[in-house]
Amino acid sequence: MSQSWEIRQYTTDEETQACELATRLGLFPAMGRLLVARGIRTYEEAQSFFSPRLEELHDPFAMEDMLVAVERLNRAIEQREHILIYGDYDVDGTTAVALLYRYLRAQCLPEEYLHYYIPDRYDDGYGITLQGIDYARQLGVSLIISVDTGIKAFEEITYAREHGMDFIVCDHHTPDDSLPPATAILNPKRHDNHYPFTELSGCGVAFKLVQGLASRRNLPFETLLPLLELLVLSIAQDRVSILGENRIFISHGLQLINSHPSVAITYLMRLGKIQPGRVDMASIYYELGPRINAAGRMAHGAESVKLLIAEDAATAEAQSQILDEYNRQRQELDQQVTREAIALVESDPQLQKQRLIILYRPEWNKGVMGIVAARLADRFHRPVLILSHSTGDFLAGSGRSAGGFDLYQAIQACSDCLENFGGHIFAAGLTIREDRLPEFMRRIQEYADSVEQTTSQPFTPTLQIDAELKPSEVSRTLLRQVEMLYPFGTDNERPIFMTRNMRDAGGTRAVGKALQHLSLRMTDSYQRIRPLHGFALGLARYAPEITRHNAFALCFELEENNFYPQSFLQLRVKDLCLESELPERLTDR
């Protein structure tokens, strides 16, 4: 299916700001536009963006309830109370549990007073459970701290309070209009909150708690630095924004991982075949993060926490091997379920017409539903919900969005059909009784049909282009400037550029085992620039037209090809078309 191309449009004021920024910073005009698109309007903001400083982290006490939470936690430490840290089973939850555990342990709180609980994905389900509260009661716990969960746990928190336990919630999910009766609720998305940055991960909220605790106990900020590696993992894997405060966390966290990683991260790096000092966002997304996530998907998230709090090499090595095996099992399972799910859609014309794809098979493993939903959303360019049997009469579902569709809002609109749900615009999870599924499917499809952005060419994938370049602007100098935006991630993706009126410079050819890819050697139509190299996955069908010297346009990311013994600028082509096809491809935004 051909993609449409949308070039980001800038207002007159934005163009003026972009031009002024680029001029003052000595950058290409396109870089000025990229900065403005990321909310950067002044020279000072640009300096902070390019050189994030820990001194620019926000005051934790600007968060509602922080003083109450810090005082309660400090009292628990001083009086040697039993504390239970309760976290979700994904990377954000397990890193948040490990962060609090490691810091409290470092504050000389004996481990006999320090406990953690991760719900079992299969037996407990998502969120705070009464089983978890009862576990805390058996341990004599007087303070529970939930991380990456708890913002909707009204019944469970009430139950804990009735049994003499105080409760601090550290969560980043969108709350309802009313809040549960906790001792303190730390959540930057609270409606009454004035904290300057709303896009913290669950682990990020936990970090703000220990930042406040360190301030209360007159401890230097340096005591918090070893925890930054956990923040990097959570921010990357939970796909929260990496602008603002998260950019500070992730920039300094990557420096830490590449200079002084913990023993846990060291062994994960070995399993992922990542050289010391070479950890980047890609290696976190595809090597470290999936291994940590695999325990909660295939067995129990507590196995990940055991690794992340390990202090000795023997424990770290053993636990990392366990997670690696879970990850291998997860890969096999998600590939199998993905094949089955794709076959269901492709064999059902009715499913292919739906604005939102919903698939249910009782035998599918709950642990891979989110991965499968993401794969299908990418393939079919629509939001996808995957459901399977959970326990008793209940089904569990996981969804991923596409095309700007707000999946959380769609599920919330049908929430009276559900037992519980949670998530955000891009991803969500839910629990539903099996007999309510038909009504839920009907209503969420009606909601999807009613949403304007899904009714206008809903099935056409769209490639978002950050800026159009003149062929003469495509250079190693621009690549070096683009790399100043690193680290890349949510809200700061690697820029996609477009240029037009390119022609073959000799050497363009189909490559690959099945000759399905395209290796490009190109110049502008007037041959005024030195030939550029490009590589396009799956676009070899254009080779005959290009080698006949037909003009073409292309969308691409800039990268360095370090193919030994030489290094050269390469355009990683996202899409291309003949110049004659361009008017049909381009749309405005």
Roles of regions detected by a PLM:
Residues 172-173, 365, 424, 517:
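Histidine-centered active-site/metal-ligand motif
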Residues 157, 194-197, 275-276, 374-375, ...:
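A generic local secondary-structure boundary/capping motif
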Residues 134-203, 207-216, 226, 243:
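Active-site cavity-forming subdomains of large catalytic enzyme subunits
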Residues 1-4, 484:
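Catalytic domains of riboflavin
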Residues 2, 10-11, 15-143, 163-164, ...:
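Hydrophobic helix-and-loop "lid/oligomerization" segment in the mid-to-C-terminal part
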Residues 155-159, 357, 372, 481:
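A short acidic, amphipathic alpha-helical/loop segment
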Residues 75, 79, 315-319, 326-359, ...:
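Mid-to-C-terminal polyanion-binding domains and interfaces
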